[in-house]
Curated annotation (Swiss-Prot):
Subcellular localization: Cytoplasm
Organism domain of life: Bacteria
Binding site for ATP: G67, N68, E69, S70, S71, G72, K73, T74
One Pfam family from the record: RecA
Species this chain originates from: Mycoplasma genitalium (strain ATCC 33530 / DSM 19775 / NCTC 10195 / G37)
UniProt protein name: Protein RecA
Family: Belongs to the RecA family.
Length: 340
């Protein structure tokens, strides 16, 4: 047995004796050994997994994904749902906006027969549902789309003339406190999609702020900002997608401030082939010499477009490169988590 394991075992026995001898067994104490490793599930994007530094979204934590309209937030969330399903997990999509495109979700790879979809009547109803889902210990991902659409019950039942300043923020604060109290003992990731608003009267600096007050940014272990940086066109000059930059503005799991560039096509979501090639080149799984690309010391293509064509024609080769790239990414993320 390693020296570190012996020390951990002695500390565990010492802590247990202290708790029992002082009649503290009725209280919940943090099990450091049990919670030392945080389980993560891929976001469905290798580039984003690398930027997060943890390999994906953490279970037992709150995550906020925010940005302006048409920046790819919903697509990122839907790809996460598809990834969780591929890992054998169950997901729930709380569609507070009532704007979920089921056909698009299916094109991304989501099994609609296995996806729970909810339309809460008001914000308090949504938080009650989230709390109940967490307690079942059967739901691994809960997506709330979006914070801005979580209308407080008091506002919904009142008249439109009534002043409700601060009501939304108070509801968010209370709801988040309740779910945070039970979330660490669960295997559920709660992902909130949020929007940016302009702060009136700000002349200098950043004049944008997320909706719902400050509670969500406080309780979130991860915060990701999505920003559209380019519109993608095909050879006929038609718009076919967007390029989005995602910055990890807060990270309590690994190193913060990672950046991922994502290509999102309107008809199918992420362009996984480009992500695999970019990371394969970064990790030297595929080696570039001038304009030539080689794998396992064998030349496979000349030019990047030719490389894409070869990999699309040879799916077995693509899967082999992808598998090795994912292994390299997992090793890197494991090192970053240990270092952090």
């Amino acid at each position: 047995m390693a020296q570190k394991e012996i020390i951990n075992k002695k500390n565990t026995q010492k802590n247990s004796s202290f708790i029992e001898s002082n009649n503290l067994t009725s209280f919940d104490f943090f099990d450091a050994k049990k919670n030392s490793e945080i389980e993560t599930i891929s976001t469905g994007s290798l580039n984003l997994d690398e930027a997060l530094g943890s390999g994906g979204l953490p279970l037992g934590r709150i995550v906020e994904l925010y940005g302006n309209e048409s920046s790819g937030k919903t697509t990122i969330a839907l790809n996460a749902v598809a990834s969780f399903q591929k890992a054998g997990k169950t997901a729930c999509y709380i569609d507070a906006e009532g704007a979920l495109d089921l056909a698009y979700a299916k094109s991304i790879g989501i099994d609609l027969n296995k996806l729970l979809i909810a339309h809460p009547r008001h914000g308090e109803n949504a938080f009650a549902l989230i709390e109940s889902l967490i307690k079942t210990n059967k739901i691994s991902l809960i997506v709330i789309d979006s914070v801005a659409a979580l209308i407080p019950k008091q506002e919904l039942e009142g008249t439109i003339e009534e002043q409700t300043i601060g009501l939304h923020a108070r509801m968010m604060s209370k709801g988040l406190r309740r779910i945070q109290s039970i979330l660490p003992d669960s295997k559920t990731c709660v992902l909130f999609i949020n929007q940016l608003r302009e702060k009136p009267g700000v002349m200098f600096g950043n004049n944008e702020v997320t909706t719902g007050g400050k509670a969500l940014r406080f309780y979130s272990s991860l915060r990701m900002e999505a920003k559209r940086v380019e519109l993608l066109k095909d050879k006929f000059n038609n718009y076919v997608g967007i390029k989005t930059k995602v910055m990890v503005s807060k990270n309590k799991i690994a190193k913060p401030f990672g950046v991922a560039i994502l290509e999102i096509m309107f008809n199918r979501g992420f362009v996984h082939e480009h992500e695999v090639i970019d990371l394969a080149l970064k990790f030297n799984v595929v080696v570039r010499a001038g304009n030539s690309y080689s794998f396992n010391n064998e030349s496979i293509a000349v030019g990047k477009e030719k490389l894409l064509n070869v990999l699309s024609e040879k799916p077995a080769l693509f899967e082999q490169i992808k598998e090795l790239t994912v292994q390299q990414l997992a090793n890197k993320n494991s090192f970053q988590q240990t270092a952090s």
